[in-house]
A protein has these predicted regions:
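Short, surface-exposed beta-strand/loop "edge" segments at domain boundaries and coil↔beta transitions
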Residues: 14-17, 63-68, 95-101
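Beta-strand-enriched cores of mature, soluble protein domains
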Residues: 4-7, 41-45, 90-91
Length: 132
């Protein structure tokens, strides 16, 4: 089973926009909107509140699929386009040869994404499940 839980606050840049007038916030958000519109499996929720944009989604599949790959790729692409974005994507694939018993977290900040091991739920077989 593949499970993804993700959230991402979308911000055009992490730089002070007053000091960087070359950053076109409208273009950044238009690019994000176009990216989202092109998704084949658009199952994310976009929340606009208080002049902020927030994306959240979850995916639950029996196996790794095109949908899981597309959603991870979209998360990474938003981070590259809107470099001020930050968030977490929790990922578990119980068929993964290396990480079958642990959640991995894709941490997004300052235009980059980095995979990390989750310490709160991993190893799953000990921290959230018990088998005799």
């Amino acid at each position: 089973m593949v499970t993804i839980y993700a959230w991402l606050e979308i911000r055009a840049t992490y730089l002070d926009e007053d000091l960087h007038p070359e950053i076109d916030e409208k273009k950044v958000f238009d690019d994000i909107d176009n990216l989202i519109k092109k998704l084949k499996y658009n199952e994310l929720k976009v929340i606009e509140k208080n002049y902020s944009r927030f994306v959240q989604f979850s995916v639950m599949e029996n196996h790794k699929t095109e949908r899981t790959e597309e959603m991870i790729s979209m998360y990474e692409n938003i981070t590259k386009i809107a470099t001020g974005s930050y968030g977490l994507l929790y990922y578990l694939d119980d068929e993964d040869e290396v990480y079958s018993d642990e959640f991995r977290v894709l941490v997004s900040k300052k235009g980059k994404c980095e995979w990390k091991r989750d310490e709160n739920f991993s190893p799953c077989s000990i921290l959230i499940e018990e088998f005799d």
